[in-house]
């Protein structure tokens, strides 16, 4: 769902 996308984006940002 949308929340899963948000979590994924947050994970990518955290990886930076």
From Swiss-Prot:
Residues with the Leucine amide modification: 16
GO CC terms for this protein? extracellular region
* UniProt xrefs under InterPro entries: Aurein_antimicrobial_peptide
| GO BP terms | defense response to bacterium; innate immune response
**Keyword flag Cell division:** no
Name the cystine pairs: none
Keyword terms, alphabetized: Amidation, Amphibian defense peptide, Antibiotic, Antimicrobial, Immunity, Innate immunity, Secreted
**Coiled-coil parts of chain:** none
Question: In which tissues does this protein get expressed?
Answer: Expressed by the dorsal and submental skin glands.
Q: Which Pfam families match?
A: Antimicrobial20
Q: What is this protein called?
A: Citropin-1.1
